[in-house]
Design a protein with these regions (language model features):
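Short conserved loop adjoining the S-adenosyl-L-methionine
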Residues: 151-157
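A short glycine-rich, Lys/Arg-flanked "PGG" loop and its adjoining helix->strand segment in the class I
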Residues: 177-189
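Class I SAM-dependent methyltransferase SAM/SAH-binding core
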Residues: 97-151
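A short SAM/SAH-binding and catalytic strip from SAM-dependent methyltransferases
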Residues: 161-175
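Conserved class I S-adenosyl-L-methionine
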Residues: 8-84, 86-95
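C-terminal lobe and adjacent flexible extensions of AdoMet/dcAdoMet transferase-like proteins
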Residues: 270-310
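SAM-dependent methyltransferase
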Residues: 194-279
Length: 310
């Protein structure tokens, strides 16, 4: 495996960029070229989830390979107190709707995928939901809604029986305490929430699309933690780097196109310790019920925290 890793590292450190520029617009200032201008711009959290990123997000993250198992584990845990056909679920920060669709496949009563990005939601409605080819009843149980999870007024009191915050959703919130309070307001008594977190010091920050081995983390076979991803796609070259300045973190992405234009974007997170999230949730009224280890879903050092509304 160490030998294969060295081959992979050499391949992706030296491979020439190739492909076509699609879904990327540079800004013409008149002072410098478009490609030069593009190198100076950074897309931040509130800007980067646009049509271009929505179109490539699933290929980059490849969450479709992990979510079926993760969703099944969550629903199995929820089954201890509720039946599938009684669940009214909120998928908070649903993105392109992959997890939303997998929840619907479980035969839940209804599910709303909430996201603040209109572009990601269009992708969810027009691509993910269509490609899923759900039976009519399951398809009709799905709704996607543009809204802010950090605003209590987004939903009514007790509107849902369950909620899920998957992938890095919790880390995008600048006010997790307020978010837990909102969820406590939206979920009726007896309901539950599932919140995905990671061990920020040990989880694998490499994107699945950048790994040379499907379902296998390179972290076990390298002396130093691998924090960079590099992938060659047909239409652009992609690089990413995870940088932890505890408790803050950045995930920086760079897309390079054949016309020499560049798109740079920076995800900023507040990565509190797992015990801090449990404390914040408890302070908002939630009862901590334990966690699900996602190693069986192919994600080491990632966990789903389960909380119950008393």
């Amino acid at each position: 495996l160490n030998y294969l890793y060295l081959i992979w590292e050499d391949k992706y450190s030296n491979k020439a960029y190739s492909g076509l520029n699609e879904g990327f617009t540079t800004i013409n200032t008149g002072a410098i070229t478009d490609s030069e201008e593009s190198k100076l711009i950074w897309y931040e959290n509130d800007q980067l989830f646009d049509d271009f990123y929505a179109s490539v997000y699933d290929n980059l993250t490849q969450l479709a390979g992990r979510y079926p198992q993760e969703v099944s584990l969550i629903v199995h845990h929820w089954n201890k107190t509720a039946k599938n056909d009684s669940m009214e679920i909120l998928d908070c920060g649903c993105g392109t709707g992959i997890a939303t669709v997998f929840f619907a496949r479980q035969g839940v009563k209804s599910i709303i995928g909430l996201d603040i990005s209109n572009a990601m939601l269009r992708r969810a409605r027009n691509v993910t939901l269509v490609a899923a080819k759900l039976p009519t009843e399951q398809k009709e149980s799905v709704r996607f809604l543009e809204g802010d999870m950090n605003m209590e007024s987004t939903f009514a009191a007790g509107q849902f029986s369950h909620a899920a915050l998957l992938f890095f959703t919790i880390y995008y919130s600048n006010d997790p305490s307020g978010l837990f309070k909102n969820l406590f307001y939206w979920i009726r008594p007896g309901g539950q929430i599932a919140v995905e977190v990671v061990n920020k010091y040990k989880f694998d920050p490499m994107l699945e699309s950048a790994s040379p081995f499907v379902g296998l983390s390179l972290q076990k076979y390298t002396k130093d933690r691998v924090t960079k991803s590099k992938v060659e796609f047909d239409k652009f070259s992609y690089e990413a780097e995870f940088d932890l300045s505890d408790p803050d973190a950045e995930f920086r992405e760079t897309f390079r196109f054949p016309d020499k234009s560049i798109r740079r974007q920076r995800h900023t997170f507040t990565m509190r310790d797992i015990k801090d999230f449990i404390h914040l949730a408890s302070a908002a009224g939630w009862k901590y019920d334990g966690y699900i280890d996602l190693i069986t879903a192919g994600f080491e050092y990632a966990y789903v925290l389960i909380f119950t509304h008393p």
